[in-house]
């Protein structure tokens, strides 16, 4: 199992939570970005810098992630792709992506994008806060526990 992070827009605090979980559980982490990242922990944590361009990092993650992997991303189209492959996805606010909700979230994203482009809605998601951080840490712990238990059964 590998934890993939769509790193360009992922909050630093979320990366730190994942790094701690990686160390505790001895799980590899792969950060994917289209620009060089700040130095990070060594050992289980690696990074890859992909070419600049829209969706290049997403394409890389979608191609490389397997059904046994966890992907951390706020990008709903990427989430839909990895869920279709059988991988697990979580957004930085701790919301789990699954077959039941990813289609609805993709439709809502497209609707909001359309409304914003027409000037009917302004702004984006609420500012990232302490509650989001706690929700993410809790979700990450639950998901990793479940995935590791399932991996042991196989």
From Swiss-Prot:
It comes from the Bacteria. Signal peptide: none annotated. CDD domains: PIN_YqxD-like. Pfam families: DUF188. Belongs to the UPF0178 family. This is UPF0178 protein Glov_0658. The lineage of its organism: Bacteria, Pseudomonadati, Thermodesulfobacteriota, Desulfuromonadia, Geobacterales.
